Amino acid sequence: MANRIDHEYDYLFKIVLIGDSGVGKSNILSRFTRNEFCLESKSTIGVEFATRTLQVEGKTVKAQIWDTAGQERYRAITSAYYRGAVGALLVYDITKRQTFENVLRWLRELRDHADSNIVIMMAGNKSDLNHLRSVADEDGRSLAEKEGLSFLETSALEATNIEKAFQTILSEIYHIISKKALAAQEAAGNLPGQGTAINISDSSATNRKGCCST
């Protein structure tokens, strides 16, 4: 997985991980991209990212996952990284009610800075700590439904629903750009050689076989 040669792909999708510090974003990133988990994971300083290439609807997609720091003092830095994102995983910790209460603030910031068509999933992380739960599964689902988001509870420690969360986001992004590509072809009269990048945002969902991203 980590050793796979991934320079050949059909699409590059940028996805941001957002949420309070300590909710497990970095471990979600390492579990999905390297199948690793670190019990002594330190808070992210600034921004870091990792990539993984996988198949989505028969296409080779390179997912570029950005882990943005949740601390208040870094929020001004991370806001710039919303630009170009076509997907987002908004994470809270099911054992810390305050991280759930802050979801709407993160969602508001995301919608202020990101493309209006961005695909968003909400994840209640650390489901392995069910005995310490302070946010009910129904609370998460209810808020996600109210805001029009997908929802899953996840565990980076046990690798529960990590794969499913990203596959869901990537598939939804692909469906959006596929519809846009079809509409563009119909508008162009299905003329051959219309090799353009089909994006839902600023050259971020980039068709490798079309033009280069900016």
From Swiss-Prot:
InterPro entries (alphabetical): P-loop_NTPase, Rab_GTPases_membrane_traffic, Small_GTP-bd, Small_GTPase
Lipidation (S-geranylgeranyl cysteine): C211, C212
Membrane topology: Lipid-anchor
Superkingdom, taxonomy of origin: Eukaryota
UniProt: GTP binding residues: 19-26, 67-71, 125-128, 155-156
GO MF terms, alphabetically ordered: GTP binding; GTPase activity
Motif (Effector region): 41-49
Record SUPFAM superfamilies: P-loop containing nucleoside triphosphate hydrolases (SSF52540)
SMART domains for the chain: ARF, RAB, RAN, RAS, RHO
Chief location of this protein within or outside the cell: membrane
GO cellular component annotations of the record: cell plate; endosome; endosome membrane; Golgi apparatus; plasma membrane
GO biological process: cell wall biogenesis; protein transport
Intracellular or extracellular location(s): Endosome membrane; Golgi apparatus, trans-Golgi network membrane
Organ and tissue specificity: Expressed in root tips.
Family (UniProt): Belongs to the small GTPase superfamily. Rab family.
PANTHER family: DRAB11-RELATED
Protein name: Ras-related protein RABA2b
